Amino acid sequence: MAALSGRPPAEGSRVAVLGATGCVGRCVSAALAREGHEVLAVARRGGPAAAGHVFAGLDVAAVPPAELARLLTRHRVTTVVNVTGGWGTTEEEMRYAHITLVERLVKAVTLMDDRPRLIHVGSIHEYGPVAEPLAIGEDLEPRPATMYARTKLAGSELVLDATRAGRVDGLVLRAVNVCGPRTTRASFLGAVVDRLRAADASDPVTLRVADARRDFIDVRDLAEAVVLTVTSPATGQVVNIGRGEATAMRELVDLLVAASGLPPQAIRVEDGPIASKGGGWTLADIRLAGELLGWKPRITLAEAMRATWQTPAD
């Protein structure tokens, strides 16, 4: 992993990572620790994913804001990073994970005497579907078309509104689709990994792949962006994080199959419908991330697919 170019952490820097045991949170926690930050790992469940960090078992969306504020104060947290995901399928589940949680988090931060910086990781899908070949810039007016995208946008707007009102020091990263180590099984790539592991040359696996092109980022590159954001003076802004490339889903699957080492006859690929939380085309304009954070993606998709295969979700 390349050295980061941001400012060194201040003495006594402690970062609370919410969602610390998920694919993104686990990688973010490790990256922060490597750069000298103390990490308070917050998640509903602990286990090996939280090893090496101070851990607090907590459902942030379920606790009163005052209780969360006391926890953050007790651990002298200087920055909160929200990488909670939520792969719920119902409107109620999405509102709980994407809106209720952020409402309580923002309220908790405002209750603290020494208010920590708040970094919220949102989604590129908040912008809604866009036409090829548009590169999605931060100035694009969001027009989300799915419940997932609408609730994710609502969560991001809570952070941005509170920052504009001077109640928090917040910043939103809008990340593209994530791949790499421990990609969640609930995602398309995670599901493909499970299918490939069950493949048999005598009984080929059929994969239905949409005719779509999407931007994907290795979770380790996303983690570097989060670390740089923690020490950046930027506030009140949205910053896109991606590779800045739209890759055909079939090409991505081909890279994953190659990483698996399976013979070609073990896989049969068929056309499938576009079933996305956003749209069939995503390509992030990532110039602002370079200007504000000194960040750029470093890991190739081939490397990311090897890591996706070699280090599956627990």
Model-derived segments and their meaning:
Residues 132, 160-214, 219, 254-257:
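NAD(P)-dependent short-chain dehydrogenase/reductase
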Residues 14-35:
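N-terminal Rossmann NAD(P)H-binding glycine-rich loop of SDR-like oxidoreductase domains
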Residues 42-47:
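N-terminal Rossmann-fold cofactor-binding loop
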Residues 103-147:
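Conserved Rossmann-fold NAD(P)-dependent oxidoreductase catalytic core, especially the SDR/UDP-sugar
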Residues 84, 119-122, 145, 174-176, ...:
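Active-site beta-alpha turn of Rossmann-fold NAD(P)-dependent dehydrogenases/reductases
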Residues 60-99:
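NAD(P)H-binding glycine-rich loop region in Rossmannoid oxidoreductase-like domains
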Residues 95-99, 134, 140, 145-153, ...:
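Short-chain dehydrogenase/reductase
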Residues 199-314:
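C-terminal substrate-binding subdomain of Rossmann-fold SDR/epimerase-dehydratase oxidoreductases
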